[in-house]
Amino acid sequence: MDLKQYVTTVENWPKEGITFRDITTIMDHGPAYKYATDQIVEYAKELGAEIVVGPEARGFIIGCPVAYALEIGFAPVRKPGKLPRKVISADYGLEYGKDTLTMHNDAIKPGQKVLICDDLLATGGTVEATVRLVEQLGGQVVGCAFLIELLELNGREKLGDLNIKTLIQY
């Protein structure tokens, strides 16, 4: 299935000069959403993933159905103040400043094989911070899966030799 046909391109959003790739039109189309999920599920099986981790909010949309299909857990990564128990945190750079991601300090067991899922690989900042959170807890990132990769932003460079799967590239 050609998933690109289900992505809506929105020019000049959220600001002038930005081309936004809207994945909600993949989610609107049940067979496309299922196909995308199934592709990532097969990848997760090949890697022997034991838990899925996803940054808010679209990482939940991608990662939760994968975890469900595999009958494994899902661990959310969130902005500060959104998780109720003790957390660990990792800062990451933005174009103008920095942001922070958090994760429950007991979300990953030492040695656990982790698949990170998100909607988009752009600069790699969010996923790189997510990798650091997993590694702080002793987890082993066996792969990262994304619906879309924006090649011109070189996000893979920030991720070193991590195993990466993307379903659509622009």
Curated annotation (Swiss-Prot):
Signal peptide region: none
Keywords: Cytoplasm, Glycosyltransferase, Purine salvage, Transferase
Pathway noted in the entry: Purine metabolism; AMP biosynthesis via salvage pathway; AMP from adenine: step 1/1
Enzyme class name: transferase
GO MF terms, alphabetically ordered: adenine binding; adenine phosphoribosyltransferase activity; AMP binding
Assigned GO CC terms: cytoplasm
Pfam families: Pribosyltran
Keyword tRNA processing: no
Keyword Glycosyltransferase: yes
Gene3D superfamilies linked to this entry: 3.40.50.2020
Documented EC number(s): 2.4.2.7
Transmembrane segments annotated in the record for this chain: none
Biological processes per GO annotation: adenine salvage; AMP salvage; purine ribonucleoside salvage
Function (record text): Catalyzes a salvage reaction resulting in the formation of AMP, that is energically less costly than de novo synthesis.
Family per record: Belongs to the purine/pyrimidine phosphoribosyltransferase family.
Assembly description: Homodimer.
HAMAP family assigned: Aden_phosphoribosyltr
Name of this protein: Adenine phosphoribosyltransferase
Organism: Lysinibacillus sphaericus (strain C3-41)
